[in-house]
């Protein structure tokens, strides 16, 4: 069945490419490589020790319909080092893109590339293994900043299937040296046969106000503070008083000079109730300090190393991350 499905997808893709070729301006292509090394030395109840080590390769080909519009198809594959070869299934990519100076809109199954939400709402481990959004995303850019609107489907919607999706908004607005960041996230999870449906909803939202110093000895220096509110409700689980709610202060600090940076957050209050958020925030008293070495930063290749210290409810843990990201793209004229 799987073989037949892939054959059907391949045949349909070839047909679409052939038809689009007659009406498009250029054949466009994209290629990428990601290397991930994430070693976590966690000792508390909220996190467990693990090492994630893998490489993902991706390729896309499509057609530039006009100056603003394009359709692309392709896929990516993750090799998790230490696992058996071909332990993971390929991830297909098929999407429409509209892009101008004010809007970048994508619909279909498209690479995440840049996280929409911070780790408190959406842990980075998800992006390692689920590199695509499936739905639609619009990034609006304006003179004062940008706003992102996301709708991400996770499963089919019919009787007998789980129904899961994420919807949210995030962005930043600048006022000279001041800025405001906003985030809203809603995750819906329903499952069961018709008439016997259980629903588990969760989400969060937050606002931060910050100040960024410019024209100083540092290349970048910013600080912000605000709050994060989360909730979790389950219509079937009678062991909890639903909905669960949390409210906590959330502060950030970032400083960079050339290839050296320091990135820090402090979350204190009630623990989060987000199954897809970073579990360390569930302790309610969490700080993270990342020392960063930006080893390479060119238009096509980025490489960085992070040594991360985690303060989890009175206990200090650490982790290390190495990340290499390469992106290439071009056109093949007709």
Task: Label the model's feature ranges.
Residues 2-10:
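Bacterial N-terminal signal peptides that target proteins for export
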Residues 14-23:
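Hydrophobic h-region of N-terminal signal peptides that target proteins for export
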Residues 22-88, 93-99, 319-333:
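Beta-barrel outer-membrane channel/assembly domains of diderm bacteria
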Residues 41, 104-172, 186:
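Surface-exposed coil loops of outer-membrane beta-barrel proteins
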Residues 43-47, 119-120, 237-240:
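Flexible, solvent-exposed loop segments that connect beta-strands
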Residues 53, 86-88, 130, 163, ...:
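Short, glycine/acidic-rich beta->alpha junctions
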Residues 54, 93, 144-150, 154-160, ...:
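Exposed, low-structure sequence patches enriched in small/polar residues
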Residues 68-69, 103, 145, 260:
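Secondary-structure transition into beta-strands, especially the periplasmic turns and strand N-termini
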């Amino acid at each position: 069945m799987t073989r037949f499905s892939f054959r059907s997808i391949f045949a349909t893709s070839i047909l679409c490419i052939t038809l689009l070729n007659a009406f498009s301006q250029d054949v466009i292509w994209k290629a990428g490589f990601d290397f991930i090394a994430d070693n976590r030395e966690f000792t508390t109840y909220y996190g467990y020790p693990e090492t994630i080590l893998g490489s993902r390769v991706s390729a896309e080909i499509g057609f530039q319909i006009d100056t603003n519009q394009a359709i692309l198809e392709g896929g990516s594959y993750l090799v998790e080092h230490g696992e058996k070869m071909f332990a993971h299934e390929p991830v297909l990519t098929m999407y429409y893109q509209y892009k101008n100076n004010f809007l970048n809109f994508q619909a279909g199954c498209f690479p995440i590339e840049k996280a929409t939400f911070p780790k408190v709402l959406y842990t980075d481990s998800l992006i390692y293994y689920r590199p695509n959004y499936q739905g639609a995303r619009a990034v609006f850019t304006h003179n004062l900043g940008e706003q992102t609107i996301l709708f991400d489907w996770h499963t089919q919607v019919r009787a007998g299937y789980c129904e899961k999706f994420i919807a949210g908004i995030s962005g930043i607005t600048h006022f000279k040296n001041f800025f405001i960041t906003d985030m809203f996230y809603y995750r819906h999870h329903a499952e069961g046969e018709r008439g016997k449906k259980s629903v588990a909803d969760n989400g969060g939202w937050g606002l931060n106000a910050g100040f960024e110093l410019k024209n100083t000895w540092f290349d970048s220096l910013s600080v912000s503070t605000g709050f994060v509110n989360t909730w979790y409700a389950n219509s079937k689980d009678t062991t909890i008083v639903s909905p669960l709610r949390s409210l906590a202060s959330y502060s950030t600090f970032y400083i960079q000079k050339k290839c050296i940076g320091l990135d820090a957050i402090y979350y204190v209050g009630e623990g989060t109730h987000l199954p897809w958020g970073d579990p360390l925030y569930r302790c309610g008293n969490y700080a993270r300090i990342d020392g960063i070495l930006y080893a390479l930063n060119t238009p096509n290749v980025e490489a960085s190393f992070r040594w991360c210290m985690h303060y989890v409810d009175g206990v200090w843990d650490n982790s290390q991350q190495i990340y290499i990201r390469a992106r290439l793209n071009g056109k093949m004229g007709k």
